[in-house]
């Protein structure tokens, strides 16, 4: 594909996520080219690296982006800043007809997990990429819910403390709220809960995710196992380091010994446990930072699909 057939994108946020995303766009994208890297710190490594790669840069935030000579050619913008800043960025970008891919927990637009529901949101002006834990675990909840009624789903995302920058740490509450909501709306569980753990271990460990689903006792275990395996393969198509750590596990919770689930009460049934690991591609970030890699990989997959639809519609 020639450069003229690619759509220009801007990345707002020159930190770890924004810089890794820029490298992915330049190395791996089928339909995108870098139009701008936007930050607020003139001395940031992300802006310096972008400048060395020939990408237009500005350290004046969204105002600087709009003032760039090539802003009129930018069709898609990634926001890799914070939930608090996103609303203002989105307002400006929508006025100029720029599609927005939100990597913060702001969730102004619909939640999108590429392998689950991207197709139905291609025309949305703003899509939200949920959270790193959501990108890793909600596909599994959806895989189970395709086979059985999921009365409750709980996910635990354990990430290396070193991979959690100031943006992640400032958005812990938004992480749990956004992920919990998407477990229900995208994963199709009746109730959802999300927990994040910052693991201080040295050397740093890769992202680990655990998914628990409560389904009816007579659910088809083999069908659930196969559905989960198929979903893992689908996610790994755009996140190569995404994998099952062990086979899907099933535990019967008998009627005579129910467990108490907050918000639901005492329940029995079949507990489905899925254990995942996410290794980063190490384009810019360390391999242990799978939590950041899955966000940038999912965002790139979504943007490429959106760009392909826009190019086709020309």
From Swiss-Prot:
Give me the residues that bind NAD(+), please. Answer: 14-17, 163-171, 291
The cross-references to InterPro entries, in alphabetical order and at most eight, read:
Acetaldehyde_dehydrogenase (IPR003361), Acetylaldehyde_DH_C (IPR015426), NAD(P)-bd_dom_sf (IPR036291), Semialdehyde_DH_NAD-bd (IPR000534)
Give the enzyme's main class according to its UniProt record, as a single word.
oxidoreductase
Reactions mediated catalytically: acetaldehyde + NAD(+) + CoA = acetyl-CoA + NADH + H(+)
Q: Which region is the signal sequence?
A: none
What's the domain of life for this entry? Bacteria
SUPFAM superfamilies under this entry? Glyceraldehyde-3-phosphate dehydrogenase-like, C-terminal domain, NAD(P)-binding Rossmann-fold domains
The active site of this protein is located at: 132
Q: Name one Pfam family in it.
A: Semialdhyde_dh
Single biological process term from Gene Ontology: catabolic process
Quote the EC number.
1.2.1.10
Q: Which Gene3D superfamilies does the entry mention?
A: Dihydrodipicolinate Reductase, domain 2, NAD(P)-binding Rossmann-like Domain
Give disulfide pairs as residue numbers.
none
**Protein family:** Belongs to the acetaldehyde dehydrogenase family.
Identify the NCBIfam families for this entry. Answer: ac_ald_DH_ac (TIGR03215), PRK08300.1 (NF006157)
Can you say what this protein is called?
Answer: Acetaldehyde dehydrogenase
């Amino acid at each position: 594909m020639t450069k003229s057939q690619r759509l220009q994108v801007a990345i707002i946020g020159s930190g770890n996520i924004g810089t890794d995303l820029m490298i992915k766009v330049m190395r791996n994208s089928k339909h995108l080219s870098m139009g701008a890297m936007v930050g607020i710190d003139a001395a940031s490594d992300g802006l310096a690296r972008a400048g060395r790669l020939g990408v237009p840069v500005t350290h004046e935030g969204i105002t600087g982006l709009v003032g760039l000579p090539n802003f009129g050619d930018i069709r898609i913008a990634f926001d890799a800043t914070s939930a608090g800043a996103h609303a203002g960025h989105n307002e400006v970008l929508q006025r100029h007809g720029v599609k927005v891919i939100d990597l913060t927990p702001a969730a102004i637009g619909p939640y999108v997990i590429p392998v689950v529901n991207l197709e139905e949101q291609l025309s949305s002006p703003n899509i939200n990429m949920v959270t790193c834990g959501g990108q890793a675990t909600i596909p599994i909840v959806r895989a189970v819910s395709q086979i059985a009624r999921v009365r409750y789903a709980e996910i635990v995302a354990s990430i290396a403390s070193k991979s959690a920058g100031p943006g992640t740490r400032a958005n812990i509450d938004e992480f749990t709220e956004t992920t919990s909501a998407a477990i229900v709306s995208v994963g199709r569980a009746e109730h959802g809960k999300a927990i994040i753990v910052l693991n201080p271990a040295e050397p740093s460990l890769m992202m680990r995710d655990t998914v628990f689903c409560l389904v009816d006792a007579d659910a088809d275990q083999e069908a659930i196992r196969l559905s989960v395996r198929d979903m893992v393969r689908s996610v790994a198509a755009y996140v190569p380091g995404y994998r099952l750590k062990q086979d899907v596990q099933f535990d019967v919770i008998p009627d005579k010994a129910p467990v108490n689930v907050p918000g639901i009460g005492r329940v029995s049934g079949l507990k489905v446990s899925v254990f995942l690991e996410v290794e980063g591609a190490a384009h810019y970030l360390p391999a242990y930072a799978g939590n950041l890699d899955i966000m940038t990989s999912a965002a790139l997959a979504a943007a490429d699909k959106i760009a392909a639809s826009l190019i086709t519609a020309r």
